[in-house]
Amino acid sequence: MAKPAQKLRRRERKNITSGIAHVSASFNNTKITITDVQGNAIAWSSAGAQGFKGSRKSTPYAAQVAAEDAGRKAQEHGMKTLEVMVKGPGSGRESALRALQSVGFQVTSIKDVTPIPHNGCRPRKRRRV
């Protein structure tokens, strides 16, 4: 028996003026999530979601494209000002921040929230190329 067709859920347009952009820049990918002040996700994007595959995901250009996409989605909900929280050692940190500013957001603060261990877990072995 066939399943009933799922209803298409439209994204309701929220009216939020300020929010937080969480930029997670790893060595392999860059993810950008834009949330309201409480932490509820409004828009997100990543380098992989923009069609970049493999080692191209880790480039600054891929991070820029992903940040512009997430920024445009957030602006549809009326967002104007952002706090930016950057996490991780990746190459897309600065380019994602610059892209968010170029989309037209007023960036009020920039925080680096990269987790630094106080000698916790043993790190992975060094790469020898």
Curated annotation (Swiss-Prot):
InterPro entries: Ribosomal_uS11 (IPR001971), Ribosomal_uS11_bac-type (IPR019981), Ribosomal_uS11_CS (IPR018102), Ribosomal_uS11_sf (IPR036967)
UniProt KW Nucleotidyltransferase keyword: no
One annotated GO biological process: translation
Protein name: Small ribosomal subunit protein uS11
Any Gene Ontology CC annotation: ribonucleoprotein complex
HAMAP family with a match to the protein in the record: Ribosomal_uS11
Molecular function in Gene Ontology: rRNA binding; structural constituent of ribosome
Function: Located on the platform of the 30S subunit, it bridges several disparate RNA helices of the 16S rRNA. Forms part of the Shine-Dalgarno cleft in the 70S ribosome.
Subunit structure: Part of the 30S ribosomal subunit. Interacts with proteins S7 and S18. Binds to IF-3.
Similarity-based family: Belongs to the universal ribosomal protein uS11 family.
Pfam families: Ribosomal_S11 (PF00411)
Superkingdom in the source lineage: Bacteria
Classification via NCBIfam families: PRK05309.1, uS11_bact
RNA-binding keyword on record: yes
Organism (species): Rhodospirillum rubrum (strain ATCC 11170 / ATH 1.1.1 / DSM 467 / LMG 4362 / NCIMB 8255 / S1)
Keywords carried by this UniProt record: Ribonucleoprotein, Ribosomal protein, RNA-binding, rRNA-binding
Matches recorded under Gene3D superfamilies: Ribosomal protein S11
